Amino acid sequence: MSMVKNSLGRLVPTEVNGRSVRPFMGAHADAGGGMRYGGSIPAAARYGNKLLADLDAAIDACEIRDGMVISFHHHLRNGDYLVNLVMDKLAARGLKDLVLAPSALFPTHGRLAEYIESGVISHIEGSMNGPIGRACSLGKMKKSAILRSHGGRYRAIQDGDLHIDVAFKIGRAHV
């Protein structure tokens, strides 16, 4: 593995989980101007009613397979149970090597550690706090965790560094 010095003079890898990475070289060392990934999405897209009968129907419709990147929004923060609920259902279906790309994980998501150790989750790209952060720090994951801030996650998705296969968000049923 090739190593290079970052802005603090520390040796860091030039590759993580099989992808080339650049070290942080200081606040203004990279002028940006990166590429945007994908085409534009109309502001008033008419996708029709995407509401399904229940979470199982939504998971079926997504055709989730081993190795896919699963994303979650964290607006409920430590009161969020959607991540746990979805991951319980994906684990029960026997899925493996999933990449979690949440905005953030909190202590309420601590039970995901069992899915890290069993191989349901191969690694996480997002902010990891509490028991999940501890599991990452102790090397429990199959691959390296990638710590991303909320804004860093946005940039990674926009620039094509992080491709999301399926995203879950709590919505309100429209009756």
Model-predicted regions and their roles:
Residues S2-H174:
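Conserved alpha/beta enzyme-core scaffold
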